[in-house]
Amino acid sequence: MIDEILRDAEQRMKKSIELLRQELAGIRAGRAAPSLLEHLEVNYYGTPTPLNQLATISAPEARLLVVQVWDRNAVSAVEKAIRQSELGLNPSVDGQTLRIQLPPLTEERRRQLVKLVHEEVEETKVAIRNIRRDALADIKELLKNKEISEDDERRAEQRLQDLTNRYIAEADKLGKQKEHDILEI
């Protein structure tokens, strides 16, 4: 039962870290990266659709993204989604191809992005701690129902804490990496 609780907690913590990876990939660093636009939602025939399901995104140059839209009718919807995103990008349309020149990041914008990274990392750490809290409650419930001994409870709590520390360290590492990428000129 304890192993099941810990396994469930670890799975949920892994999902939190994966979500953080996706969020950080969407935050622009100094160079163009297709991941910046991949999960951008496009209103495609009334349905929110990720951009990577409507187009091929590439970065042929350090400050240029090229979006090759597969459906001619979706070009204006893709352009609108990119313009309205919080990324501050201005695509130029050439047939079914959108070219997006990325302006160099100003020092102020870099600081804003670093702040955003810190917020995302903190959100993930809070989510991980909430997962720990839920698992602890489950362990306490087992003790209360006399399904485990106090020694088992203490060992389970220690294993859970080790798990929590590992995933929080992972979140911090991802945040520091992204911060370094943003501040790198």
UniProtKB/Swiss-Prot annotation:
> Any idea which UniProt keywords this protein has?
Cytoplasm, Protein biosynthesis
Work out whether the entry's keyword set contains Transmembrane: no
Where is this protein primarily located?
cytoplasm
Q: Name one GO molecular function term.
A: ribosomal large subunit binding
In terms of InterPro entries, this protein maps to:
Ribosome_recyc_fac (IPR002661), Ribosome_recyc_fac_dom (IPR023584), RRF_sf (IPR036191)
According to its record, what are the GO cellular component terms?
Answer: cytoplasm
Q: Which family does it belong to?
A: Belongs to the RRF family.
Fetch the HAMAP family from UniProt. Answer: RRF (MF_00040)
Question: What's the stated role of this polypeptide?
Answer: Responsible for the release of ribosomes from messenger RNA at the termination of protein biosynthesis. May increase the efficiency of translation by recycling ribosomes from one round of translation to another.
What's the protein here called? Ribosome-recycling factor
Origin species: Thermomicrobium roseum (strain ATCC 27502 / DSM 5159 / P-2)
